[in-house]
Structure formats: C-alpha cells, structure tokens
Amino acid sequence: MISAAIGSRLNLMDGTMEGVPTTKRYLGDLKGCFADERAHALALTRGNPLLYSVASVESAQGDGQLHYGLGMLMPGRVGREYFMTRGHYHAWRAAAEVYVGLRGEGFMLLED
C-alpha cells in the first residue's frame, strides 16, 4: 500500500512541504521555556514573533513506519538565549531521530 505521505512535496528554497499540516509556534507559546522569564515578558511587549514551524507527515501505523517532518527555526534571541523549540518526548524511548541542517548556521542542543 502506498501512503499519501509520499505525495508530499519538499521545497528547499522556502523550507515548506506542500499538502501537509504545519504547526507554528510563536514567542507567547514558549512561556516557561526560557531561563530568563523577565526577558521573555519584555520581548513579548515588542511583539509575538514566529519562533519556529514544523510541517509533519503522518506515517502509516505499525512497526517500521517512518514519521518525518521539516522544521524551520527562525533567528533571534530572548535576552541572551537564542530562539528554541519547545521540544518533545517520545513515547517509545528507543525511537530514532535525525536532524539535518539545510541552510544557515547554528547549533542543535539535544537532550536525552
């Protein structure tokens, strides 16, 4: 059976995937994620910018199925901290996860 996910289109120029749901997270969505909560509150008085977006393709159910997505992290800081994602936990701890930088410069700090 061929999954509808195969029909998704990846656009490397603008970092989008056509035809899949996209989640957007703004500064206000990450309350409690930054170490300097005062800097976060101050930054919110200047606006509620987009911090990151994730386009996700849901896989078929069952062992060996691949769930994949395309995340785009925006440049910027809150106080002395760079923009970040909220993060997530895997229900199945042994799940593999791969990150590939497509464009730009930066660091990924991952927690296990």
PLM segments and residue spans:
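Eukaryotic intrinsically disordered, low-complexity regions enriched in proline/serine/threonine/glycine
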Residues: M1-C33
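Active-site region of the double-stranded beta-helix
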Residues: P21-D112
